[in-house]
């Protein structure tokens, strides 16, 4: 398969750390034999992470914990028997004997907690919230085999498990837990909040419907190949069962010149972000091909009427992914308080790191959470 052929399938993919030839820890028999890199071995990724003691790759990231400032505490907790790696950001002068509202921040497809999810978690802590950014199960620094499984059920449970952790975190007001989902994490956040009312407020930034994109292709570019791709995913699952070999949709390895020629803003700017400017060693777009069996049956926009909490959905006004948020927001008939907010001039990826757009998003979040949480 040529790079440009799999680009359409894999660019919005999942994240994971390298774990080649590792035994599968559930069935106990499966062994990964993939030749696909399951992490980012690039010099850019290593250099970015090395700049910060916590491995954070966003601007103005915490580099040490100091009194009177936002602090970061790496934590680990169990979810369905797996170890989940997370960072908890606490406000300046945090006092565990007091009561604080808290926010779960769900990372994008292709992201880890040290990237945009960490940025927004830190900024929320600066506003006085306890915030948690975590790596999805089977991805990043979290546990799970095979690596890079990327299924909706897992991603939704990850969000719930982060809230479970906050329920037991001393200083968190259990009646004031909200959620912020970014990109793919936004789509899964909508699903989690439809049924789990632990989340008192729901916000998304540049939400991405992973099911819609995997099924139809981004901007409906792959509708004609749905059945063939389902057949390929079915064959990949059968291969796992019969041989133990795990097939992956690979992470595209493109030159700067090839990236510049990509016409979709999301994919072009996303590759720049994840492969260059904000690359992280644990971040990759590779995911197990068999995951498509669940992904292609997922729809973030279905049952949106079940959300009765205050809802804020933010998109860049120039984002080519905005149709996904529009589609989901249109179905949100169950809440009396909802807002679809456009960040003027921003593309999808711009909202991840460009100060002029991050500041607008944070100002809106401050208002939204302040009024409703």
Q: Could you say what each language-model-derived stretch is?
A:
Residues 190-272:
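Alpha/beta-hydrolase-fold enzymes
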